[in-house]
């Protein structure tokens, strides 16, 4: 069978890599893909970004299954369109994707269905937003209501920072985020204390299967300093997600979400990613929902998945996830993102990448912001590569990933040296 993966990041490279390992697959296409997918012998890039043109191509090629990586095509309704033309596609409809594409929809949904989350208010009037911050004080969280590539969130340590973020998002709207009703809007919410975890599940509208737990590193610099990014590294499993926390997350967050969406007439199919904050008592609260796999969490999760992903997604697109039990490698996988100089604000592009190691069973370099120029690979964006390693312990996986990362070079390359530091600490 032929499979299409939509997207161009490290997450899509990892999904395509995993799908291409299935004996049922004749060819995996990635649209538009990147330098890594271009040069992989098992994958083929399709240089189409227009979704209607891609649908026509998929019909002509008789694509048996399409998997959507990023949020933008989901918010644009790619799933609705492919389905309307009889194509099998895994992902949420445009209406269901609002759990991610609209912060206000998401928070109102959680309030309505009793899903634990931070207290919040939504504002489009700067004056009222400033007054709310003055009343609540800091630390406080200010979020642009709409898709902002994971960067539309300011955790303000002081009231001044919060006021500046409001001016930025509502006054200047420098992120250029328009929410679904047009105009700028912010969600301001209480700051939650605890440890974060990425809890990702597969849904078929009614049934849910949990993926392995993982933990992302959002900040640019070591010790969780610097600006927020799309994610600088991740590992799986996350020790903070104990069996007890796992049970609570399913009971208090995931199942009420899937049931609530169904009840609201918007059944959810696809990957659902709950960003959780787990407090000292092991109680999870929902920071945000993403309606797709995380990036870079997908890379270590795919390294650990032993089940045939094609079988799993065919079941998920037939409403048969209740028949699926996922098999996982018991080892730890850890991925380190190598980012371009100037990331996240103004990443450099066009630099030659050298020293890429050949993939092995235990170390794979997934590509994101890369482009193939002949048989050379150049940088083309913010997060360039994700070096992912599998080993018996988090410390060994860390060593293996960093050893591989040190062989790679491109001008201005930057990466964190402490990915997995919480898990290493927890293992002592």
Can you name each region flagged by the protein language model?
Residues 249-272, 290-362, 373:
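Active-site "cap" helix and flanking loop/linker of ATP-utilizing ligase/carboxylase catalytic domains
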Residues 169-173, 192-241, 250-297, 344:
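Phosphate-binding core of ATP-grasp and ATP-grasp-like enzymes
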Residues 116-118, 139-142, 156-198, 256-264:
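Conserved ATP-binding module of the ATP-grasp superfamily
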Residues 1-94:
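ATP-binding N-terminal substructure of ATP-dependent carboxylate-amine bond-forming enzymes
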Residues 50, 371-374, 378-428:
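Generic C-terminus detector
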